[in-house]
Amino acid sequence: MNKLIPVPREFFARDTNVVSTELIGKALYFQGKTAIITETESYIGQNDPACHAARGRTKRTDIMFGPAGFSYVYLIYGMYYCLNFVTEAKGFPAATLIRGVHVISPENLYLNGPGKLCKYLGINISHNKCDLINNNEFFVGDIGLKLPYSTTARIGITKGTDKLWRYVVTDITNLISQYNVQP
């Protein structure tokens, strides 16, 4: 694989659903580990009842109102971290949750679930508000991989379940052929 280069901030500063779908097949690089993003979910603004910013700006959600291309990491159930990327224009709270990845380096490993991927990668609350653009240790890179995906309702939430804002890879043939991953 060629040297990974972070995608530009403009990549994240767009419609959240566009970003969520285009993150599928991108490489997530974190402190020496590389994983292909295989599942995402969108959380969009104050009219989305499942979005953390639905009730307005708080200390916790402040990062969602900031510029795009930053990490938003939080704890759920008192034990699992979740990784999100801030999207859209500054002042509009939105983010993409990274729900699943396929690790390609240093080993071959499929991780389904935001808690599993954060635990494996070592992502925790100290990685909240990281700039993903000007960062050599934590970023998203485009490796030119296109993977087919399906659109479904978001999972693990109780509000906004009618939104078809979950995107999950349906066929990893390209991933297998290019990176010799095991299904």
Curated annotation (Swiss-Prot):
Keywords: DNA damage, DNA repair, Hydrolase. Its EC number is 3.2.2.-. It is an enzyme of class 3 (hydrolase). InterPro entries: Formyl_transferase-like_C_sf, MPG, MPG_sf. One of its GO terms (biological process) is base-excision repair. The keyword DNA repair applies. GO terms for molecular function: alkylbase DNA N-glycosylase activity; DNA binding. It comes from the Bacteria. Gene3D superfamilies: Methylpurine-DNA glycosylase (MPG) (3.10.300.10). Belongs to the DNA glycosylase MPG family. This is Putative 3-methyladenine DNA glycosylase. It comes from Rickettsia africae (strain ESF-5).
